[in-house]
UniProtKB/Swiss-Prot annotation:
Heme 1 binds at H37, C47, C50, H51. It comes from the Bacteria. This is Cytochrome c7. May be involved in anaerobic iron respiration. Heme 3 binds at H67, C84, C87, H88. Residues 1-20 form the signal peptide. Belongs to the cytochrome c family. Binds 3 heme groups per subunit. It comes from Geobacter metallireducens (strain ATCC 53774 / DSM 7210 / GS-15).
């Protein structure tokens, strides 16, 4: 029974990776933000870093979440954009 549950969980996880968008665009009044999802999957390697509740939409996602989580991760890794104009493009 444990093997069946583990197999189903793995299937759902892999399906999420297979059907995830390559790039997402988030509308913002000071310029849209293009998010290279596939690139982040490859670099971070752990979906739960952002998708804490599992595959799909991120609970609580919005400006405050993105600034805290995305910018915070970039600062922590010393890699990626951290200034407004680096992400927001008009």
């Amino acid at each position: 029974m444990k093997r069946i549950i583990a197999s189903l969980a793995l299937s759902v996880f892999c399906a999420g990776l297979a059907f995830a968008a390559d790039e997402l665009t988030f509308k913002a009044k000071n310029g849209d933000v293009k998010f290279p999802h596939k690139k982040h999957q490859q670099v971070v390697g752990n979906c739960k870093k952002c998708h804490e509740k599992g595959p799909g939409k991120i609970e609580g996602f919005g400006k405050d979440w993105a600034h805290k989580t995305c910018k915070g991760c970039h600062e922590e890794m010393k890699k990626g954009p951290t200034k407004c104009g680096d992400c927001h493009k008009k």
